[in-house]
Regions:
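Glycine-rich phosphate/pyrophosphate-binding loop and the adjoining helix
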Residues: 100-146
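Generic secondary-structure signature for well-ordered alpha-helical cores
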Residues: 10-14, 60, 93, 97, ...
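Generic non-transmembrane alpha-helix signal with a bias for helix starts/N-cap capping motifs
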Residues: 2-3, 23, 85, 123
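Helix-loop-strand module that forms the ligand-binding subsite of alpha/beta enzymes
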Residues: 23-107
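Charged catalytic carboxylate motif
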Residues: 1, 29, 87, 129, ...
Length: 146
């Protein structure tokens, strides 16, 4: 999903797109970016532990320094995803970020332990939605809309 969104954003050649895994991202990356697309699996009705760690490490160093920047959210969920989206929205509200779209929730319908642990295959329509969200964020930044 994140790779598809990055590919969509990269179509906007006026911008530099940087795709980072949560453990590799730091406050400096947030401060250097003009906008954000946060992507995470939902685990036990919450954002992943690695994404939570990212927000824990970067929240205060970025506070009052990223106000007004645009953001979007993508969640890969087994059945719901809304609680994870709300968690990120609350963090983004604290940072005073501006949402550009409702959270994109891709539901895998994984309900059994085997399905939950299995590597997920995201379908073409969902990947296109991810690409489109990345492209929308990038185009809005390039045009000065966001």
């Amino acid at each position: 999903m994140a790779q598809a969104a990055a590919a969509g954003a990269a179509a906007e050649t006026a911008l530099a797109v940087k795709l980072l895994a949560a453990p590799d991202a730091a406050a400096g990356d947030l401060l250097a970016a003009d906008g954000y697309l946060f992507a995470t699996p939902e685990n036990l009705a919450a954002i992943s532990g690695l994404m939570k760690d990212f927000f824990d490490r970067t929240y205060y160093p970025a506070l009052e320094r990223v106000n007004g920047r645009p953001y979007a959210v993508m969640i890969c969920a087994g059945s719901d995803g809304h609680n994870a989206a709300r968690q990120i929205e609350r963090i983004a509200t604290g940072w005073r970020l501006t949402p550009i779209a409702p959270a994109l929730i891709v539901c895998t319908h994984a309900q059994t332990p085997e399905e939950i642990l299995r590597t997920k295959q995201i379908g073409p329509a969902d990947l296109e939605s991810c690409r489109s969200l990345g492209a929308t964020l990038a185009a809005g930044l390039a045009l000065g809309i966001f």
